[in-house]
């Protein structure tokens, strides 16, 4: 059996991996090796490894590498520690392929570790662009370290090929997270309210905002200005915590302070978990922030999205997304909630959807001879 080592560091990643993990675990030709790290093991971010275990997956190794600090060096230190710890894990597991997704700093550490140990890498969600985040450089770096690529759109497939990757090893699979959404057992409003001990108002937004790591000095002022604009609207908001990138803790501090001043109108939660997150997204009138979930997943629910700033700049999105800068936030929220725009969103399909996404990935993991030997492909 071909041993596939899946390494995941955060909840959003796990949502992408989930349908793939299920099929690897039941395959007669693949053996699942599961390694969790970083935010999954952090109290601050909800100890989400427990959800993975609850879902029935055996975790082979836990890599406790997150150095939580406001210092700009915390992510590089966390990545370095991940490499040290993962080196021993990969020696122990001896995987045939390391399967990674996306563009997190801990994913870069995992890719660097596997590459230096001559272990082939399969990468999901390469070729995408997010100009306002250092993730953009991380993602392209992982692409060059990987041997086989599963992209979410044809445009991203072409970009990976443009980066010198052999077309026969670049497969457009669609976004696997959408499978997770379509198979979610959605939770009722009543149960959600009981779970979070907060009454959901008739018109509310789901807000997720992460640091713009390419310009970290602006994060504090940005979140203060954003919250000031939101206060001037009439909507209620459920705020989810920012991630562990530099500046995330400062964003979370201001979110908590803001919510504490009007707890009937606003609610803050560190980690909703996948089922609750998607269930609340389904109920919400509007998605606000700068998370990829607004670009990729929200279209499954035909929801209007107000995408703030440059963090997702360059990423392909549907017509349900309104891009705005902070001064135009209120105007964009009003447009997103207008009857014409809401009705337009209801007619749209998700450009990232492929009903066979996880099957495509599994088929190629089984049938492709994945080697670390690569030649640059010239256009």
Summary of predicted features, one role per range:
Residues 100-101, 108, 149, 273-317:
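A donor-sugar binding/catalytic signature common to diverse glycosyltransferases
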Residues 7, 41-43, 145-221, 373:
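A nucleotide-sugar donor-handling region in carbohydrate enzymes
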Residues 299-344:
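Nucleotide-sugar donor-binding patch of glycosyltransferase catalytic domains
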Residues 31-75, 85:
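Conserved nucleotide-sugar phosphate-binding/catalytic loop shared by glycosyltransferases and other
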Residues 338-379:
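C-terminal amphipathic helix plus adjacent low-complexity
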Residues 63, 151, 171-173, 268-270, ...:
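Short acidic-hydrophobic, aromatic-tinged amphipathic segments that line or gate anion-handling sites
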Residues 7-8, 14-25, 65-167:
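Active-site and donor-binding regions of nucleotide-sugar-utilizing enzymes
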Residues 52, 187-283:
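Donor-nucleotide binding loops and adjacent catalytic segments primarily
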């Amino acid at each position: 059996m071909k041993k596939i080592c899946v390494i995941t560091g955060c909840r959003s990643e796990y949502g992408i991996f989930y349908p793939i993990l299920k099929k690897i675990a039941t395959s007669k030709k693949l053996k699942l090796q599961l390694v969790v790290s970083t935010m999954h093991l952090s109290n601050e971010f909800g100890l989400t490894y427990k959800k993975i275990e609850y879902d029935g997956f055996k975790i082979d190794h836990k890599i406790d590498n997150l150095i939580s600090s406001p210092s700009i060096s915390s992510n590089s230190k966390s990545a370095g520690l991940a490499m040290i710890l993962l080196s021993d894990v990969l020696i122990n597991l001896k995987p045939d392929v390391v399967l990674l997704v996306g563009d997190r700093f801990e994913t870069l550490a995992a890719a660097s570790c596997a590459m230096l140990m001559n272990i082939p890498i399969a990468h999901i969600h390469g070729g995408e662009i997010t100009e306002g985040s250092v993730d953009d450089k991380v993602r392209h770096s992982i692409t060059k370290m990987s041997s086989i690529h599963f992209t979410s759109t044809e445009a991203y497939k072409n970009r990976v090929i443009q980066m010198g990757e052999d077309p026969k090893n670049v497969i457009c699979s669609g976004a696997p997270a959408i499978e997770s959404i379509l198979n979610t057992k959605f939770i009722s409003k009543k149960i959600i309210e009981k779970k979070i001990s907060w009454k959901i108002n008739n018109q509310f937004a789901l807000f997720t905002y992460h640091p713009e790591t390419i310009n970290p000095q602006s994060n504090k002022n940005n979140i203060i200005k954003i919250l000031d604009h939101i206060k001037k609207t009439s909507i209620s908001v459920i705020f989810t915590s920012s991630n562990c990138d530099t500046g995330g803790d400062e964003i979370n501090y201001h979110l908590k302070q803001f919510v504490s001043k009007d707890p009937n109108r606003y609610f803050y939660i560190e980690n909703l978990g996948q089922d609750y997150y998607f269930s609340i997204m389904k109920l919400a009138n509007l998605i606000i922030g700068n998370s990829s979930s607004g670009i990729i997943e929200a279209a499954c629910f035909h929801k209007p999205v107000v995408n703030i700033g440059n963090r997702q700049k360059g990423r392909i999105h549907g017509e349900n997304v309104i891009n705005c800068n902070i001064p135009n936030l209120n105007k964009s929220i009003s447009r997103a909630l207008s009857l014409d725009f809401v009705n337009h969103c209801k007619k749209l399909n998700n450009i990232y959807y492929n009903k066979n996404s996880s099957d495509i990935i599994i088929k190629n993991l089984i049938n492709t001879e994945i080697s670390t030997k690569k030649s640059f492909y010239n256009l």
